[in-house]
Amino acid sequence: MNGNDFLDKMELIDLAYVEAADKVPKKKRAAWLKWGAVAACLCVAAAIVVAVVPQRGEPQPSESIHLGTTAPSESERESDAPTEPKTEKPSERETEATTERNSDTVSLEKITIPDLYAGFGFEGFAVYDISEYRRGNPWSPDMDLTTLPVYRNGAYDPSRAGVPRGFTEEEMKEQLERYADAFGLTILSTETKWENVYVKLHDPRTERKAVWVEAQTDGGVLRAVASGSASYTPTRERARLPEGYRFTYSSTTDEEAMKTLAYLTELYADVLGLVQPVAVTCGDYDYYGKFDRIYFIYDGAGTAEEVILNYNFCRVGFASDEYGDAKDDSEKSEAGSLRYLSQSNTLLLAEKLGDYPIISAEEAKELLLSGCGQSSVPPDYPAPTAETVEHVELIYRIGALEEVLLPYYRFDVRLPDKSNCGAELGLKSYGVYYVPAIAAEYITNMPTYTGWFNS
């Protein structure tokens, strides 16, 4: 959702997005705000055995109990034969793209690009150098991808309150049973959380639905959310990490973080059905230069497309109990322990609309520079230029406010230094811009960036 920290009704936020917000309040942050758990972060990513880049200044997806694919389309059922990889040169692709799209994908419906909601502030981040900025995204411009799937989001909230939707109360209870079996837990009791009165007032015709179901077990608390995510909060005994592990948000080094992720992966990846887990540790800085780290894993098994879907839609996040009952930084734990883990899978409720032809990152950059795209960066900042666009990656935007789930090129654009954004510490600020990755002929409303919450 946009942004994940802006809802004060914390009980209505999908657990897949609250990790960063579920901490003791910190010092005032810079003008940028995180969109999601990984939307604004300086990341270090690797498979468990791969070394990470040192942090500055430091002394569809796979089958599982939760990560599953959506139902295949009729055409996919008729033929399981893999598509032959295309080998034409980039120049050939440019000259033949329109003909190929028209002949192979005439049945695809046109897509309306969802509006971009940013809540308070705008989406951006700060790093010391863009070369440090790694989020663990498996996509690269060298991948031979000509199409990517587009989905209708079954967890979309038309009230735009950001309320998790999708599964019924009974379906969530069934999920809890599967998780309890996987973790070897016995469910003792369950409690259902219902939508608050705001949703009913917004549209009196709307039937009040269950938001989540929580189960007390003999080994902790399980929670299934209507949007498809789930979490497990272990008992204090189960949550404690062995000696020698460090699991904090700001005082853990990259090496320590990867060691902790390796331990947690060994403990939970197989239970959750990850075949080839890839660990990512990332974070961003406030304007005092304080680093704020998060931890997650995703399944790196499968084709390039499947891994991209796993990365964007199907993650397991780990939250630290670094603060415990502490009121501020001075009282927090030095080593930390596991507060909870959360597993997301937006595709559980998604309806596949088809495999849509995509444009290249270079084509998307040209569109961005011509004024096409979406951003929550305020209008008093200069428009992107070829010189200020410093990083690009392909992502899917997720959350209850995204009616359609489609690939975008995300551009990180250097913003002018401002005194309240850590520039005096050497931090550089970046704003985030999006350009739809699907071909323009399949878009009904190619967005144009005119500044300030455009659509």
Which residue stretches match the model-derived regions?
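Intrinsically disordered, low-complexity polyampholyte segments enriched for Lys and acidic residues
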Residues: 34, 84-89
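Segments that shape or occlude catalytic/ligand-binding pockets
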Residues: 258-409, 413-421
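Disordered, charged N-terminal biogenesis/targeting segments of membrane/secreted proteins
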Residues: 1-29
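C-terminal soluble interaction/assembly domains
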Residues: 400-408, 414-455
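Single-pass transmembrane signal-anchor helices and their membrane-water interface zones
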Residues: 10, 34-61
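Short, flexible helical or helix-coil boundary motifs
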Residues: 17, 183, 187, 372-375
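Preferential activation on post-signal-peptide N-terminal prodomains/segments
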Residues: 61, 65-72, 78, 90-317, ...
